[in-house]
Structures are given as C-alpha cells and as structure tokens.
Design a protein with these regions (language model features):
Chain B
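Redox- and metal-dependent alpha/beta enzyme cores, enriched for Fe-S-associated oxidoreductases
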Residues: 115, 197, 201-256
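Short, flexible loop segments at boundaries between secondary-structure elements
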Residues: 181-201, 234-243, 290-300
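A short, acidic, amphipathic alpha-helical segment used as a generic capping/interface helix at domain edges
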Residues: 150, 256-273
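Iron-sulfur-cluster electron-transfer modules
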Residues: 1-126, 135-163, 169, 179
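Ferredoxin-type iron-sulfur electron-transfer modules in oxidoreductases and energy-metabolism complexes
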Residues: 1-18, 255-263, 295-300
Length: 381, 300
C-alpha cells in the first residue's frame, strides 16, 4: 500500500469509528463542550493556572518546573536524568518539540521509546507521521524490516502479532533496568497536581511506575482547572482518536505513596520515589494573549483533523516535516506557536473539514488564515 | 514543502495581483469581450439596482487553474502594459470552454430572473471580488481592494447582489466582516424555486458553500427538489469527511493541486460515476479526472 491508499483507508475508518463511538457514548459530546469551557478559563489566565498547578504538585511531594523554551527544558530534564542512565519514554510530542531524546542520548544515556509506533519510528530513524499513530505510514513489511534489527527471528513474512511480541520482549529487558521514565501528559489538573494519561498498550503504566524516577514533560496548554476536567480530557481525546473505551487511563499524583500504616500517607511506596513535572511554555503563553491564535491552545491532540485535511492526505509528514512533531491542520497552528514558522499555512486550501471534526470546535481555518497573513507580511515586496 | 519557492511565488503573485486589480479590477489581463458575451447574446440589462455578479469566476476558472504556470511570466515582466499585451495573448479560454460557460451563465440568469424580473449586469465594469487576495492571506491588500470594489458598486447604485459562485459569496461575507460592505447579497442557489433537472450524481461539496457558508443541507434540498438524484456516502460526502478539489493551492503548487483533485475524484467516483459541482474552480480541477457537471448544467 502506498501513502495515499493507507490514508484514504484510515481516514474513512476513523470517521466512521468516531461517529459510532459518539452514538454509543453520547455523553462524550457534552464532556467535550464542558472541557472547551474549562480550557478557555485556563487560556484566559494561564499564568495563574501554571502557578496553581506547580503549587499542587509540590504539595504532593513532587517537584514542578516551568521552562520558558526548549533550551531551558532540556537543561532541567538533563540535570534530573544525569548521565549513563537507562531512560524509557512514552510517546510524547513535547519531547520531540524540544529534541529531548537526542539531547539525552548525547549525554550518554540509553533512551528507548516504548510506544510501539514511536519505537518503530525510533529504530528506523524516522519522524512521526501522526500525533496519535506515529508510524501510520509504515506497512507490516516495513515494520518487520525495522524490528529485524533488534530481533533476527523477525522477517518480512512475520505476522503483526510476532512483530509486537518481539518489541515487547526487547522493551521488557529495558524496563527492568530503567532509571527514569519520561512521559508526556494528556492533561494536568491544576487543583490536584495530577497528571492524566491515556493509552492502550500498557507501556505508559510501566513507564510511570517501574523506574524509580518519573518525569512528566508537557506544555502549559495541557493544564485544566480540576481533576475532573483532566479525566474528561483523556476520555474525549481517546474517543475522538477513535479508540474507545481506551484500555488504560493513568493518573499520577506525585511520587508513589501509602497510607496503610496508621492511615498516615508516606512516600515512596512501590512505585517511583521521585516525581517531576516539567511544564513548557515555548510560545504558548504568548499565544494565549493573542486573540487570533489563542484558540489553538484548546487542542487536545486527538489527531482527527489530520484525516479531513487534503494537504496532509496528499503530502503526509512531508508537509511540515521534521520542523515539528505536529502536522496536519493542528500542526500548522502548533508549528507556528512553537517555532514561529508561518510557511506551512500557505498551503492551506480552507477545505474546512478540520473545524467540522474537531472536538474542541476550534475554528482552525480562521487561525490558519491569521498565520497565512503573518507569512504574507514577511514576503518581500 | 519547498518554503523558498512558496515565498518567491507568493511575492510574485501578490505584486501581479495587486497591480492588476488596482489598475483594472481584474486579477490578470483578460479579454472582457469574451467574458461578457453571454449577456450581450441574451440582452441582459446593463446596470440596475439588483445585479447578477459573475466576478469572472466561470469565465476565468481554467486560467486560475493554471495560475502557477502563468505567474513566472508575469513576474519576469516589467510594466503593466507589457503584461497586458502578453497576458491578453496568453489568457484566452478555449472555444469549448467559452461555449460551456456562456451556457451556464445564461441558464443561471434565466433561473434567477424567475424570482426577479429586473436583474441587471455590470458588463465590462464588473470588478473581480478579490477572492484570491483573501485566500492567499494578503489581508491588508484584500481590505484595500475591497474598499475599491465597494465604492464601485455604490457608484453604480447597486443595492442587491446575486452571486453565482462560492468564492465570491465568501469574499463578500468577509468584506462585510472586515470593511463593513453592507450591500445585501444572496447566492443564486438560494433563490431557486421551480427548477427542473434529471440525473444521478454524487455531489462534491464546495468547501465554502457547505462548510463555511452554512449551505450543506440547503444545497442538497435544492438539487433534490429539482428532481436530481444524489448518492451519499458519509465517508466521502459527509460534512467533515468530504474535502477540497485542490483548487486553492494551485497558484502555489500546481502538482499538489492536481494530486488532491485526483484523490478527490477517486473517492467521489467510488460512490457514483457522475459528479456534480457547485463551483467553477471545482469543475476546472476535477474534470480532468472524472465526469463532472455543474449544477447549472443539470437544472434549469
Ligand atoms: S485541532 Fe481539534 S481535531 Fe485537530 S488534533 Fe486538535 S483537538 Fe483534535
């Protein structure tokens, strides 16, 4: 199958699957509407919510940091991890945004992606094609070819199940000796300091409890007012990504703890003894103050808008390429927020499907039009 | 994507567009005799308070389609006079296209005349709406030119406009938003009452009509009421699943525009072999890859 065949199939599949999920679980639509309102509150007052979130994390016995840009974020995490460690990553777009994996590798750490798609991208030295399904453009044969490098028993005739099992075996050997687990966050609750993550593979569960240190790194846009909102966000994200119910929802509130003796909560227990939340600004705060741009911060990265975009469906990852892990309609907005790069917007054909399918009802074409305008001002007269 | 090429192309297009629009109200030199002959042939009244507004869209659709091809020629030329003479030679629609758009425009005129006897046309004095400026993101230039268009309509004492394509309708909607353009306008599709038509089609939605101007349902009702059968498939014609013909990216990347058109034509023809469109640019883009008809070719 070539890209155009894969994407046509996947797009039609996602469209119908999400429609069915919304019929079977009609409350998801209400949750999405409520979530939009709650996220708007945060955008209107981002500084306050960042502070509230950081205070909540510290109260739990965790540590919270705010990095203003990529360099600061890398330095904070680099210092926490140190050198010659084994680090397991769950899929995190922010880590791509700041070039974290390469940075840690350069500092003599062994770093492994544990999400299957992301792992395939890592071992084939590629770049994620889609925020939810990073290896969307890979066929079974291509995946087998990549995995053969770590397990010679895999060949081009191997079944998908065998490829998955080979990766699982390999990753298990890394989990047991991992010093640090690095995850992203689907949402962070300002009131409780909890990080919510949704997944199906089980790798995030392991990444967040097995290594003695858990670092969650995410953008300040992922902050929501309450724990309830955080759980809403993971449910809505999973539904609009087309996988519902999700196999796992993970909530982490500080380092592991127990209150089993005399009901006194102490840390650590079985899981990590250290929990760090690294919040990244990298253009988000500025965007929250820009009337034309701020709606983009509502994005919950469900990846649905990609499928309704004619440019993404034609160019795939070549559109925004390695400039950003965000692609498709949301990627045009997010590549601008994080890199100040207006050019991918020039290709927007204002097809408008993106705004129809977006759970957060972001007027994506309108935001992109603004970015186009910024680009047009930079074009020589 | 080739960022440097895009920057260069955008700069050239803007210069060519702005120069032509500010001097002559058209985006590139075009033969107005050809563009207006449809109206001369049926004696459409000149001017009037209610006008049919073509914005040259049906007449220029094929040129827009090949805009990227023309732009380097425009860009390498100096004064507007040279552009005009070379452009006039370059930009002449094919005979068969002229015949086709004349018939479409005349049919649309007859359809709208049923709801209002006194509909005029500005002939050579009709301005192009400026859609391309808006769609390429040249907002400052769009507003500046929009004011000129608004003034021109006022000079002609126009108080009611009937649009016939989605790009112009969308542009007037935005002129209203950005510069207070307050002359009422209605797309002709919303004025159709007793039209008749036949055939079985899959509708390729105009992105602007269906996803920006709230006409997704009403367009279907109009077509079906005329007796035309529409075949639907939610993954192809659903409001959020259907996608563009590729036209708008044509000026920057013709190859990409064609690839989108080809992909769109493939999904559409998987539903039904004959495709119906509501926009001249959709027609120009898709007709290379499938059998397409404009709504105004199947209802009368
Ligand atoms: S912009 Fe909307 S549809 Fe696209 S990824 Fe974000 S939330 Fe999902």
């Amino acid at each position: 199958m070539n890209w155009s065949q894969i994407i046509s199939l996947v797009s039609a599949g996602n469209y119908m699957e999400v429609e069915k999920i919304l019929q079977d679980y009609p409350y998801i639509v209400d949750m999405a509407d409520h979530l939009r309102e709650q996220k708007l509150k945060v955008i209107a007052n981002l500084d306050t919510y960042v502070k509230r979130t950081m205070d909540s994390v510290e109260k739990l016995g965790g540590h919270a940091y705010l990095a203003k840009d990529k360099d600061e974020a890398r330095k904070i995490i680099g210092d926490l991890v140190g050198e010659k460690k084994t680090v397991v990553f769950s899929k995190t777009n922010v880590a791509y945004e700041i070039g974290l994996r390469e940075f840690l590798q350069e500092r003599n750490n062994e770093v492994w992606e544990t999400d299957l798609g992301e792992y395939l991208v890592q071992i084939s030295r590629g770049w994620p094609t889609h925020i939810v399904a990073p290896a969307l453009d890979m066929t079974r044969e291509e995946a087998a070819k990549a995995v053969k490098k770590i397990d010679p028993s895999i060949n081009e005739n191997s079944k998908i199940e065998d490829i998955v099992a080979a990766v699982r075996k390999f990753l298990m050997s890394k989990y047991v000796k991992a010093d640090v687990g690095i995850t992203g966050a689907n949402a962070v609750a300002a009131d409780s300091g909890s990080v919510a993550l949704v997944e199906n593979e089980g790798n995030i569960r392991i990444d967040t409890v097995m290594p003695p240190m858990h670092i969650a790194v995410t953008g300040i846009d992922k902050i929501v007012p309450t724990m309830r909102d955080a759980l809403d966000e993971v449910m809505v994200q999973a539904a609009y990504a087309g996988i519902f119910p999700p196999t796992y929802i993970n909530v982490t509130s500080g380092p592991s703890s127990t209150a089993d003796i005399e009901l006194r909560r102490v840390s650590p227990a079985t899981g990590p003894k250290d929990f760090h939340l690294v919040l990244i600004d990298n253009g988000r705060l500025e965007a929250s103050k820009n009337e034309d741009l701020k709606e983009a911060l509502l994005c919950i990265k469900c990846g649905r808008c990609y499928f309704s975009c004619p440019i993404y469906r034609t160019l795939g990852k070549e559109w925004i390429s390695t400039k950003s892990p965000y692609n498709g309609p949301t990627g045009v907005m997010w590549n601008y927020i994080t890199n100040k790069d207006p050019w991918p917007a020039s290709y927007c054909v204002h097809s408008g499907g993106c705004k129809e399918v977006c759970p957060m009802k972001i007027n994506i074409p309108e935001v992109i039009k603004y970015i186009k305008f910024i680009g047009s001002k930079q074009v020589g007269k | 994507m080739d960022e440097d090429y895009v920057k260069k192309q955008e700069a050239t297009i803007r210069n060519v567009l702005v120069k032509n629009l500010m001097e002559s109200y058209v985006p590139f030199p075009l033969d107005k005799k050809i563009a207006t002959q449809w109206a001369y042939a049926i004696n459409v009244p000149r001017g009037g308070s209610t006008i049919i507004y073509t914005s040259y869209m049906y007449q220029m659709a094929n040129v827009f389609k090949s805009y990227e091809k023309y732009v380097p020629t425009f860009g390498s030329l100096g004064s507007s006079k040279i552009i005009a003479s070379i452009g006039a030679k370059l930009i002449k629609p094919k005979e068969e296209d002229i015949k086709r758009f004349n018939a479409i425009l005349q049919n649309i005129y007859r359809i709208v005349k049923r709801s209002n006897e006194n509909i005029g046309y500005l002939y050579e004095e009709e301005p192009y709406s400026g859609s391309l400026l808006y769609e390429l993101g040249f907002m400052d230039e769009f507003k500046e030119y929009g004011k000129k268009v608004f003034e021109l309509f006022k000079q002609h004492k126009v108080s009611n406009i009937i649009t016939i394509d989605p790009h112009t309708t969308n542009t007037l909607t935005n002129l209203k938003k950005y510069i207070g353009f307050d002359i009422p306008f209605t797309p002709y599709l919303n004025l159709i009452k007793e039209a008749k038509g036949t055939g079985k089609f899959v509708l390729h939605d105009s992105c602007l009509y269906s996803r920006f101007l709230g006409m997704y349902e009403s367009i279907r009702t109009t077509i079906r009421s005329a007796g035309v059968e529409l075949v639907e498939d939610p993954t192809v014609t659903g409001k959020g699943a259907g996608f563009c013909c590729g036209g708008p990216v044509g000026p920057l990347n013709d190859k990409l525009s064609n690839e989108i058109a080809k992909a769109r034509a493939e999904t559409l023809t998987s539903v039904n072999k004959d495709v119906l469109v509501a926009c001249p640019l959709c027609y120009a883009n898709l007709s290379e890859f499938c059998n397409v008809k404009d709504i105004a070719e199947v209802i009368a």
